[in-house]
Amino acid sequence: MNELDKNYSPNEIEEKWYKIWEDSKYFAASLSSEKENYSIVIPPPNVTGILHMGHVLNNSIQDTLIRYNRMTGKNTLWMPGCDHAGIATQNKVERKLAEDGLKKEDIGREKFLEMTWDWKEKYGGIITKQLRKLGASLDWDRERFTMDEGLSYAVRKIFNDLYHDGLIYQGEYMVNWCPSCGTALADDEVDHEEKDGHLWQIKYPVKDSDEYIIIATSRPETMLADVAVAVHPEDERYKHLIGKTLILPLVNREIPVIADEYVDKEFGTGALKITPAHDPNDYNLGKKYNLPIINMLTPDGKIVEDYPKYAGLDRFEARKKIVEDLKAQDLFIKTEHLHHAVGQCYRCQTVIEPRVSPQWFVKMKPLAEKALEVVRNGEVKILPKRMEKIYYNWLENIRDWCISRQIWWGHRIPAWYGPDRHVFVAMDEAEAKEQAKKHYGHDVELSQEEDVLDTWFSSALWPFSTMGWPEKTKELDLFYPTNTLVTGADIIFFWVARMIMFGMYELKKIPFKNVFFHGIVRDEIGRKMSKSLGNSPDPLDLIKEYGVDAIRFSMIYNTSQGQDVHFSTDLLGMGRNFANKIWNATRFVIMNLKGFDVKSVDKTKLDYELVDKWIISRLNETAKDVKDCLEKFELDNAAKAVYEFLRGDFCDWYVEIAKIRLYNDDEDKKISKLTAQYMLWTILEQGLRLLHPFMPFITEEIWQKIKVDGDTIMLQQYPVADDSLIDVKIEKSFEYIKEVVSSLRNIRAEKGISPAKPAKVVVSTSNSEELETLEKNELFIKKLANLEELTCGTDLEAPSQSSLRVAGNSSVYMILTGLLNNEAEIKKINEQLAKLEKELEPVNRKLSDEKFTSKAPQHIIDRELRIQKEYQDKIKKLKESLKSFEE
């Protein structure tokens, strides 16, 4: 046995072991293994991202599952990779350009893309290095990037297939537009936040009349693009104006008054301005009545040149100016408060603008049907189960997906335009030219679509594109469908549902069998962690302070299935203390195994005490519990089971009792000592295996010091429960001993008696099994509780001046004579009695008051009665204690 350093220094061992693991190819999946296969694909982090606490939780969970399945003898693949993150990455590069006073248009598309690839090469490896620091046992030789050539080919293939199957179409429609990112967004990329705003009431004069219609709007700047005013056909206020012409304020454009039942007579003034270019509902009304579409905003949210007075103003600046001008022309009535949901870009939180523009869409309903079916029939299992309802609701009400983005970084849409704008969708330009030649009868010049695909489009192929699809590969045969997807609930629509759709569409197979949604990591007061709030600690700083194992274990231990995690650094102290406890217990074990050779032990000659049988039973029970919990994705309960076994059962009890046997060198106790040594080694070695998936570094370091065979703990068999060794009767007997010892320790703590002072104890029990257990384990109890005398029997009298506790069916008395200052104790008890009796008085008065008891609700009376009984019980116990001191 090799000794451990005195102090546990996690940072030193982490770097050492990760390098050994990676260099030794322990993480690599085999393509020729006869073992059962188990696979997970990583939710690809943004290529320019850095590790945050959400990554820590997500990857700690995945690594725990992978390491557990690897140790159960499976051929595991954890597929690594990064996402190109179109908008996010482009924004970073554009900000870099802006430092030099440049825009991307100043350098052109080709140069900008070169610059973005350079940026990716420079910063793209940061997140993968950080995942290594976390101990993630990913198969790094298979690392993928969503814009690798193979994955790009897969994107073009599915686009072509969907298009030629009529599931991708192009058209001019109303979309969500982000003026900051300069691109369209899908519906689910818009976050709706409740905000306080205003309704402005404006006069719209009737042509050739003194009358006017009052319009209420939350976006007065859009009036520049109004083309009509709609009223309800049955609204008596406006019936006489239907068909009349209004003069649009400030613009002086003539617009009609139309009637439609869509208008809500009760909202605002009951008159609705129609702006088809800037509101989805108005857009639909505009199409219905064949109204013109007038655009008043540039793509970056400024007023267009058609309105010289406001041209170039930002939309919100224009709003102020327009309201001022309306007031100046006596066309403004008043402002009202409005609390409403405002759509914001999920990337940059800019208020989105509805905008009519040509875009590419995927028809979602046909794809959604299969995705619904595989969850309903149980092929794909979603955990926690409550997430199924959210999944169903979204898919049952799904809208077509806008997949085109007006940015440069990403997968350029594989569509080419002929001279007359006829579209040719192909795998590459050569194929598009072949199609064009067939269409036109001769060669023509083609221009490729400028837009790129939504980042989530390529991400939806991730489980199979990373394994070589559309080629037929060994990886797909062995590892697809994957077993488990671990992800945050916030991307159930962006990513999870779409992966199922695309997997079913192209491979006719589900992409994964289980989806495990974990919660969001929040701060201790429930806020989502973010840089802007300053409440998001740098995981690398935490790793330096606490060590990776402590962080991983603490995060998993404190994360209930599907619940958000309220994080504080206080949580990490538990993990660090646990690691130190295991380290120190191991040092003790190793120091007491000098000259011990586990291979030479004849197990048939060992002398197993109750404590040995108990720890064997608990080991097997824990192995069973951990397996059940991990397979149900209750990782927190699995971690708690390992913690309670190693910290509680092993360190706090077994090791302490083992000391009694280890320090006894009597000739007739040699077998007892050898048994204790063998059990310490066995339980520690098996316990390290149990703990390894959660805390890989410390377990490897310790295991290497005590191992008999093998190169690494990660390839050892995970402990398998032997039900025949789980003995409920044995456990009950030892739990009784723990209860007796704990009750005596509690008396010392409550009475302020030093643990170093030997005590006299009387245990009276009517239970023969308890009495037998006491008699057989008297030595252990006396040592653990520091007793000079232990008297056990049936129906023994309570000693005077003693403190009583109950353990099982036994009355446990600690004789306080000589341990306490009697006068001081009597004084303390009298003070406590006086305080409790004073607090009880108003409760008694209330319950003896007929007015209260006749009028108060029954649950209030019951509460007061419960309080009264609690006080009475406390007073009774104190009086009994006082009596024992006065005897």
From Swiss-Prot:
Query: Under which EC number(s) is this enzyme classified?
Result: 6.1.1.9
- Entry coiled-coil feature ranges: 817-887
Return the broad EC class. Answer: ligase
Coarse class of the primary localization is: cytoplasm
Which GO CC terms are listed, alphabetically?
cytosol
Residue interval(s) of motif 'HIGH' region: 45-55
| InterPro entries linked to this entry | aa-tRNA-synth_I_CS, aa-tRNA-synth_Ia, Anticodon_Ia_Val, M/V/L/I-tRNA-synth_anticd-bd, Rossmann-like_a/b/a_fold, tRNA-bd_arm, tRNAsynth_Ia_anticodon-bd, Val-tRNA_synth_C_sf
Q: Does the keyword Transmembrane apply?
A: no
The record describes the protein's role as: Catalyzes the attachment of valine to tRNA(Val). As ValRS can inadvertently accommodate and process structurally similar amino acids such as threonine, to avoid such errors, it has a 'posttransfer' editing activity that hydrolyzes mischarged Thr-tRNA(Val) in a tRNA-dependent manner.
The free-text domain note is: ValRS has two distinct active sites: one for aminoacylation and one for editing. The misactivated threonine is translocated from the active site to the editing site.
UniProt protein name? Valine--tRNA ligase
Q: Which organism is the protein's source?
A: Fusobacterium nucleatum subsp. nucleatum (strain ATCC 25586 / DSM 15643 / BCRC 10681 / CIP 101130 / JCM 8532 / KCTC 2640 / LMG 13131 / VPI 4355)
